[in-house]
Amino acid sequence: MISSTALPTAATKPPSVPPSIERLLLLPLIALPILWLAGYFFPPINHDVAAILDVSARWVNGERLYVEVIDENLPLTFVVHALPVLTSKILPGDPSFWFTAWVVAGIFASFWACRRLVKLVPSADHALTEALLPPVLLFLFTVLPNEHFGQREHILFVACAPYMIASMARGEGILLSRGSSIAIGLVAGVALAMKPHYLAIPAALELYLLIRRGWRTTLTDPIPWAIGLVAVAHFVSMYTIFREYGEFVMPLAVEAYAPIGDTGWRGVLTSNVLAPTLIALVIFGLIAVIFTKTAAARVLVVFGIGAAISAIAQAKGWPYHVLPALSAAILLAALTVRRRSTATCRSAAAAITCRWR
């Protein structure tokens, strides 16, 4: 008979992988998306992005926004897109190049922040999670957008990813530092305020966190206040700094936007763009909530629901509208894979131990 003392038990830790080997295995997952980013510097740029950059350039060059150059997009959209235009006046390169450069810089900044924030989520305190989620996020930032790179939905997800992961930590009782919370809220707020539909995301998230944490914790959390501050300041600017937009352009935009396309929100629900995303969100959301049993998974589901509501509210069914919701569904799948992989490994170790006892 083989002695059980010579064999590993369920409590025995598997042999650890040297850090150098781990980094080597993760290298392709990090390097390939970075190489993919290089392709975005070659023309053509996304046509919607090009149109917004053109309006921003005319505004920066002296034309009066909403008077001499009229566009239905909100003022903050042109403020954000004025940054690459202004950069091109200081440094070599045209606005489209610097737009791509600024988005790429934002991707790396968001990726760095997300890697740090993942370590604060108690239920994500696992080597596989810390190894898997950042490369998946980098894939969602770089490869998934493809021809929609730079669309506001893409910028939204990149800017809100730290807010999303911070909310996963907040949902599990973690309090972030005041400085980090304000920075996360302000960055997310700028992206969320570029379209009114986007505000469905923080509305859903903060409502869930309010129910889970109560009024006291919610009212002392700087993140929703920072987001709200940006949204309110933007709204006020529509009737002060950009008065022509609030008084004349916005009523015309509301009237003109609805007839664009012939789908409507009911058609969007069953379209070949949103319907698969909703199905994936429901399936992976249920699996994640049932198998992981964590507040972080539920927060991620709520983020996806808010993003889906945003896409439905736009009532167009355009592919890039679902990018944030689709990204949430993919992250839910990654989160579930990690949890089930861990459980499977533990079950396998226990089974082997029992076999040889």
Predicted regions and their residues:
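Membrane-interface alpha helices of multi-pass inner-membrane proteins
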Residues: 178-196, 202-207, 304-313
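Membrane-lumen/periplasm interface segments of specific transmembrane helices
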Residues: 220-261, 270-280
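Hydrophobic, aromatic-rich transmembrane alpha-helices
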Residues: 111-115, 119, 274-307
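Short hydrophobic/aromatic helix or loop-helix immediately within or flanking a transmembrane segment
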Residues: 54-57, 70-93, 101
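Perimembrane helix-loop-helix junctions
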Residues: 3-5, 18, 201-228, 290, ...
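Transmembrane-helix motifs of polytopic, lipid-linked glycan transferases
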Residues: 101-124, 162
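Hydrophobic/aromatic-rich transmembrane helices and adjacent perimembrane loops
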Residues: 159, 200, 314-348
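Membrane-interface transmembrane helices that cradle and orient dolichyl/undecaprenyl
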Residues: 123-126, 155, 161-183, 280-296, ...
